[in-house]
Amino acid sequence: MRTEYCGQLRLSHVGQQVTLCGWVNRRRDLGSLIFIDMRDREGIVQVFFDPDRADALKLASELRNEFCIQVTGTVRARDEKNINRDMATGEIEVLASSLTIINRADVLPLDSNHVNTEEARLKYRYLDLRRPEMAQRLKTRAKITSLVRRFMDDHGFLDIETPMLTKATPEGARDYLVPSRVHKGKFYALPQSPQLFKQLLMMSGFDRYYQIVKCFRDEDLRADRQPEFTQIDVETSFMTAPQVREVMEALVRHLWLEVKGVDLGDFPVMTFAEAERRYGSDKPDLRNPMELTDVADLLKSVEFAVFAGPANDPKGRVAALRVPGGASLTRKQIDEYGNFVKIYGAKGLAYIKVNERAKGLEGINSPVAKFLSAEIIEAILDRTAAQDGDMIFFGADNKKIVADGMGALLLKVGKDLGLTDESKWAPLWVIDFPMFEDDGEGGLTAMHHPFTSPKDMTAAELKAAPENAVANAYDMVINGYEVGGGSVRIHNGDMQQTVFGILGINEEEQREKFGFLLDALKYGTPPHAGLAFGLDRLTMLLTGTDNIRDVIAFPKTTAAACLMTEAPSFANPTALAELSIQVVKKAENN
């Protein structure tokens, strides 16, 4: 039906007869001439109808936005004065000789001249996806997956599929369950990741595996989360953690070079402890020049409990954040930042405004200065490298509250004051995570997943001091987003059972849930390691959007609903009966 795409016509096509198929993006009726902007997935081209082709001109008068049409015509160069430098096709236009209206369009529920609500965009997603910016995002996503496949193939990886209907395993979120009609009362689980299957593939001898795969997690959503998402899943045998990172870093550098024309360079490596200390986060945004500075040792003897308490508590922390030029902040802005850190459990936000250092105490403005000696204030200013015009904020509490609150404040202030360089790309690896974290109930939970190997520890050493264990794990972070994470896996049965025991999984439960894995570990399991990238998040970064729904063709809302199809929906009673399922309604509160 077509010979060319609208958006691909150039001066090289001048004089050629072409047939185009697409949609009316806009129509301009000048009486004797009618111009339309005709659009397809590749872009927009101007088509015009003149009186010499009376039939086509007459039919063109009926055109409205989003009519689906076919046009045959001749490509012509535009006059110099009519060239549109803002359009890729702006140097040419098509003189139509024939027009076919393939399908007419009703009055549109989306308005191209206004910003539509996200609810409307999701309900009429098939119309929203016609917009050039949305089409470009999905084209970029397709390019990314193509580049990934070629790269992985070139590096000896095998694309192997793993099951969608599998067994529920604890991976940190709730599973989506699928009832079995054949096995009454039993359920499959949709995979949160192919984690165990890819490890089993390593045990099967397929030493380089990858898959671009759907995963499912029934969890509360955020702007960068979806109940179903896509991973670039990778696993290797006989490779160390640095070797895995080297290959995966090369993949990501390849993507940025091909999609953005940007060489990311070598990725710096930072330990979890350093990231938390300097940035209050295991996902630091290195585009932001600010860092946290520990000052607890300077404040242990002050007569100000807000500082002295955490400074003398082994579980406490006092951190300072120097904001260049921050002395210009108003009291209202400072109060807003104080309320902001309270979201993370902080009690407030102390500060020192540095107006003129040379004047000593008279050159600063601070509600806490009266509790501090001139020597201590000078020491704080020296340690933070404060200059005239700067602001110093303080966080004082337990380590987690300080890290969470001050880390979030660092990001917010950096964005608010334009200190974060939005034009840069700042990738890094974060390594050496704690293997376990407190579950809040006196036990431990795996910081990554229970199949991650500890670093330089035997099973006996791990059992004796699990709180000291460092995971042989690594995350890739770009501009403050975790885009991928992985680890060296446990390849020894005793170590795996030790980890299960630390996590409170008794031997009976181990056999019930992971018997197949424990059995497989008995038969010459190779050392193996892997990683998974979030394709949706990678695409989000590469297309410059801050909403992951913009890079998924048919996403869910934050309530995990599809507004277009109205999923989820009630099941047919007959289907439920066949599955031996009865829906129990919750009693309403009186």
Curated annotation (Swiss-Prot):
It is found in: Cytoplasm. It catalyses: tRNA(Asp) + L-aspartate + ATP = L-aspartyl-tRNA(Asp) + AMP + diphosphate. Its EC number is 6.1.1.12. The keyword Hydrolase does not apply. Residues 195-198 are annotated as: Aspartate. Keywords: Aminoacyl-tRNA synthetase, ATP-binding, Cytoplasm, Ligase, Nucleotide-binding, Protein biosynthesis. This is Aspartate--tRNA ligase. It comes from Shigella flexneri serotype 5b (strain 8401). The lineage of its organism: Bacteria, Pseudomonadati, Pseudomonadota, Gammaproteobacteria, Enterobacterales.
